[in-house]
From Swiss-Prot:
Keywords: Disulfide bond, Phospholipase A2 inhibitor, Secreted, Signal. The lineage of its organism: Eukaryota, Metazoa, Chordata, Craniata, Vertebrata. This is Uteroglobin. PROSITE patterns: SCGB (PS51311). Binds phosphatidylcholine, phosphatidylinositol, polychlorinated biphenyls (PCB) and weakly progesterone, potent inhibitor of phospholipase A2. GO terms for molecular function: phospholipase A2 inhibitor activity; polychlorinated biphenyl binding. GO terms for biological process: embryo implantation; female pregnancy; negative regulation of interleukin-13 production; negative regulation of interleukin-4 production; negative regulation of interleukin-5 production; negative regulation of T cell proliferation; negative regulation of transcription by RNA polymerase II; negative regulation of type II interferon production. GO terms for cellular component: cytoplasm; extracellular exosome; extracellular space; nuclear envelope; secretory granule. Belongs to the secretoglobin family. Residues 1-21 form the signal peptide.
């Protein structure tokens, strides 16, 4: 769980850099599928970025880890992402 939360927070920090006023919709979809959808949906969302085999395997391992989290914390992480993206710190 700590790994998934850490990854999410690092991702949010990268998305909210001063050089980026908005989150790439495709990247946001990857994160949402990571947290809420099936492994096959997550893999399909990642394919847009042409990951190599090591990246695919790492993503699959991460998805398995995230899927062990209860539903409520995953929903809370999505809400946190939305809140951070809408924050004045990201604009």
């Amino acid at each position: 769980m700590k790994l998934a939360v850490t990854l999410t927070l690092v991702t949010l920090a990268l998305c909210c850099s001063s050089a980026s006023a908005e989150i790439c919709p495709s990247f946001q979809r990857v994160i949402e599928t990571l947290l809420m959808d099936t492994p096959s949906s997550y893999e399909a969302a990642m394919e847009l970025f042409s990951p190599d085999q090591d990246m695919r395997e790492a993503g699959a391992q991460l998805k398995k880890l995230v899927d062990t989290l209860p539903q409520k914390p995953r929903e809370s992480i999505i809400k946190l992402m939305e809140k951070i993206a809408q924050s004045s710190l990201c604009n």
